[in-house]
Amino acid sequence: MTASILAAQIEVGEHHTATWLCMTVNTDTVLSTAIAALIVLALAFYLRSKVTSTAVPGGVQLFFEAITIQMRGQVESAIGMRIAPFVLPLAVTIFVFILISNWLSVLPVQYTDEHGQTTELLKPAAADINYVLALALFVFVCYHAAGIWRRGIVGHPIKLLKGHVAILAPINLVEEIAKPISLSLRLFGNIFAGSILVALIALFPPYIMWAPNAIWKSFDLFVGAIQAFIFALLTILYFSQAMELEEDHH
């Protein structure tokens, strides 16, 4: 009986909604996404000013320079900077955007709703399946557009289905359809699981809740960074596969 009461108090996967232009939107996800986007833009202008200045690089600049160097190495080894220089800024932007979206939920910003329950104001956007699907579909469209640009409007779908062995064309088609699904569900599953754990910790008595909450929030920073890096890394890999030519093997 007690377990049933506690389970009923856990609210995970529920979102505050509103109707905009005859469409129902999750306002908490929109808020987190908008704040993350503004932070990314602010960081871009800040780092741009630091790069063009003669001052000693600070910690923030060195952190993002390290990320850019790491991503540049991945793009160079997978595709080649001369072939697809546009993949590097795209991968870095996706990484930073997802990273900030994930890390926003770590901030101790809470409020009490009309039912008297304490709720996080900034929920992780990646815990909303709509957010991760939109990101994955954006990447899906971008790397196929790059593949058409590199291989041609006829050559790209032929190479896509044929792969390295023509007889595996049906499997290659299923694999291609599964890419955005797996890319989105990987990110969603990890972040959503974190939301469930936070909801469980919230049921602890206040005098001991701070300890597991602090431990999990620290680990959540690590999980958010790893998942953002994996998403960006797979983005580079998918661009590499979509832009590969036959002569690249010779």
UniProtKB/Swiss-Prot annotation:
<feature type="transmembrane region" description="Helical">
    <location>
        <begin position="83"/>
        <end position="103"/>
    </location>
</feature>
<comment type="similarity">
    <text>Belongs to the ATPase A chain family.</text>
</comment>
<keyword id="KW-0375">Hydrogen ion transport</keyword>
<keyword id="KW-0066">ATP synthesis</keyword>
<keyword id="KW-0813">Transport</keyword>
<dbReference type="InterPro" id="IPR000568">
    <property type="entry name" value="ATP_synth_F0_asu"/>
</dbReference>
<feature type="transmembrane region" description="Helical">
    <location>
        <begin position="27"/>
        <end position="47"/>
    </location>
</feature>
<dbReference type="GO" id="GO:0005886">
    <property type="term" value="C:plasma membrane"/>
</dbReference>
<keyword id="KW-1133">Transmembrane helix</keyword>
<keyword id="KW-0812">Transmembrane</keyword>
<dbReference type="GO" id="GO:0046933">
    <property type="term" value="F:proton-transporting ATP synthase activity, rotational mechanism"/>
</dbReference>
<keyword id="KW-0406">Ion transport</keyword>
<comment type="function">
    <text>Key component of the proton channel; it plays a direct role in the translocation of protons across the membrane.</text>
</comment>
<dbReference type="GO" id="GO:0042777">
    <property type="term" value="P:proton motive force-driven plasma membrane ATP synthesis"/>
</dbReference>
<dbReference type="Pfam" id="PF00119">
    <property type="entry name" value="ATP-synt_A"/>
</dbReference>
<feature type="transmembrane region" description="Helical">
    <location>
        <begin position="129"/>
        <end position="149"/>
    </location>
</feature>
<feature type="transmembrane region" description="Helical">
    <location>
        <begin position="219"/>
        <end position="239"/>
    </location>
</feature>
<dbReference type="InterPro" id="IPR035908">
    <property type="entry name" value="F0_ATP_A_sf"/>
</dbReference>
<keyword id="KW-1003">Cell membrane</keyword>
<keyword id="KW-0472">Membrane</keyword>
<comment type="subunit">
    <text>F-type ATPases have 2 components, CF(1) - the catalytic core - and CF(0) - the membrane proton channel. CF(1) has five subunits: alpha(3), beta(3), gamma(1), delta(1), epsilon(1). CF(0) has three main subunits: a(1), b(2) and c(9-12). The alpha and beta chains form an alternating ring which encloses part of the gamma chain. CF(1) is attached to CF(0) by a central stalk formed by the gamma and epsilon chains, while a peripheral stalk is formed by the delta and b chains.</text>
</comment>
<dbReference type="InterPro" id="IPR045082">
    <property type="entry name" value="ATP_syn_F0_a_bact/chloroplast"/>
</dbReference>
<dbReference type="InterPro" id="IPR023011">
    <property type="entry name" value="ATP_synth_F0_asu_AS"/>
</dbReference>
<dbReference type="GO" id="GO:0045259">
    <property type="term" value="C:proton-transporting ATP synthase complex"/>
</dbReference>
<keyword id="KW-0138">CF(0)</keyword>
<feature type="transmembrane region" description="Helical">
    <location>
        <begin position="191"/>
        <end position="211"/>
    </location>
</feature>
<protein>
    <recommendedName>
        <fullName>ATP synthase subunit a</fullName>
    </recommendedName>
</protein>
